[in-house]
């Protein structure tokens, strides 16, 4: 699956939000290069909507075609389209691995999933965009537990809060999905209604 692989800090500075999580370079200088930082640009309604879409896309590592597909799926579901969109993004397997604390970044989580380190309900899944469901059980493969990323994960588990809709068993890094997340449980700094307005035009 295609994805953005360019400099994440540059994107964070352009959109004025840490898209990686714990990006020290962004924290030191949260504005684009240049003596005076980014030139002042009139923020039209369209620009604000576009920025929110870009934030969501780069936060979750999704390109336009797949993002639009997620929006269309969210729009078909009952309830608020914006809430549904964030729920679909949060339920990606790579995001769940990241949220559970088994990877430092979503990029790293995507790589771990792609390399086949996980099973879902006992079956190998190596598709980062795989949608987890309520009651799913995600395990690290036994032979993978002894590799460096998961040794580090065991040592650092709990350093980052795990959302209430997930549970992690520290002894074997098992992830239990108790429910699909509600909007209040998603801390992604995105105003999803602006994305809905953009696609509704």
From Swiss-Prot:
The S4 RNA-binding domain, residue ranges: 91-157
Annotated Gene Ontology cellular component terms: small ribosomal subunit
InterPro entries listed in its UniProt record: Ribosomal_uS4, Ribosomal_uS4_bac-type, Ribosomal_uS4_CS, Ribosomal_uS4_N, S4_RNA-bd, S4_RNA-bd_sf
Claim: Ribosomal protein is one of the keywords in the record: yes
GO MF terms held by the record: rRNA binding; structural constituent of ribosome
Keywords assigned by UniProt, alphabetized: Ribonucleoprotein, Ribosomal protein, RNA-binding, rRNA-binding
PROSITE patterns assigned: RIBOSOMAL_S4, S4
Record-level GO BP terms: ribosomal small subunit biogenesis; translation
Keyword Metal-binding attached: no
Role description: One of the primary rRNA binding proteins, it binds directly to 16S rRNA where it nucleates assembly of the body of the 30S subunit.
Family statement: Belongs to the universal ribosomal protein uS4 family.
Protein name: Small ribosomal subunit protein uS4
Organism this protein belongs to: Saccharopolyspora erythraea (strain ATCC 11635 / DSM 40517 / JCM 4748 / NBRC 13426 / NCIMB 8594 / NRRL 2338)
């Amino acid at each position: 699956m295609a994805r953005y692989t360019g400099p994440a800090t540059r994107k964070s500075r352009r959109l004025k939000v840490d898209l990686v999580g714990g990006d020290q370079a962004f924290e030191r200088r949260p504005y684009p290069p240049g003596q005076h930082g980014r030139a002042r640009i009139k923020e039209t309604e369209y620009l604000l909507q576009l920025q929110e879409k870009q934030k969501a896309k780069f936060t979750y590592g999704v390109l336009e075609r797949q993002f639009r597909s997620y929006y269309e799926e969210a729009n078909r579901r009952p309830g608020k389209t914006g809430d549904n969109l964030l729920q679909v993004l949060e339920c990606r397997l790579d995001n769940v691995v990241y949220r559970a604390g088994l990877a430092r970044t979503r990029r790293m989580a995507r790589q771990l999933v792609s390399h086949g380190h996980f099973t879902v309900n006992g079956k190998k899944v190596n598709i980062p965009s795989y949608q987890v469901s309520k009651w799913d059980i995600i395990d690290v493969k036994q032979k993978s537990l002894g590799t460096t990323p998961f040794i580090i994960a065991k040592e650092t588990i709990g350093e980052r809060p795990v959302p209430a809709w997930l549970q992690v068993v520290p002894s074997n890094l098992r992830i239990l999905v108790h429910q699909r997340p509600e909007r209040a449980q998603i801390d992604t700094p995105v105003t999803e209604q602006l994305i809905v307005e953009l696609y509704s035009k």
